[in-house]
Amino acid sequence: VKYRVVLLTLVGALALSSCTLVAPNSAPSRVKTVPFGLLSPTIPGTNHARVRFITQPVYIVDAAGDLAPSSRIVPEPPALATVIEQLLLGPTHIEKSAGYTSALPKSLVVLSATVDEATGVGVIDFGSSLNALPPKQQLLAIGQLVLTADVVGAKRGLEIRVAGVTQNVLLPSGKHATLVTPRDFQSLLNG
């Protein structure tokens, strides 16, 4: 019985060791067919259109507590929703090490963000309000949004909504407005 166990163990080990004995090939082999067009020069599902990327400014809070532009890479043409998503990611590691921050809460959820081409007014709809933020942080957060939206095409201003309801937001002057413009927040820019 002992010899059988040893013999079966040796046969099993030999059988398993042969699984790893693959003849190495010194040259890579060419794959003839790749499914789903994964090697094509365009992104699958884009109707053979090439996606181009550009740098787009977003506004973050510098070490002095002022708003400053910083570049992000986004698909061209830049859509407000895409640029706001980049803004919500906050400063990069390099920017953080230089003292840059964001006044926007990390938990902020964008429901929609669009610019009406005819009017030049941007609308961002959030899942929660910015009113819970301290006043200084709220001003910086709104400034980040309106200045970033301006460079994407919201030249006439920005309307901030929460679950579809237009918000009356705080301005640096202490007043409130439903449509905020970049001019309202010029005093928060660095320099």
List the model feature ranges, each with a label.
Residues 1-191:
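Bimodal "functional hotspot" detector
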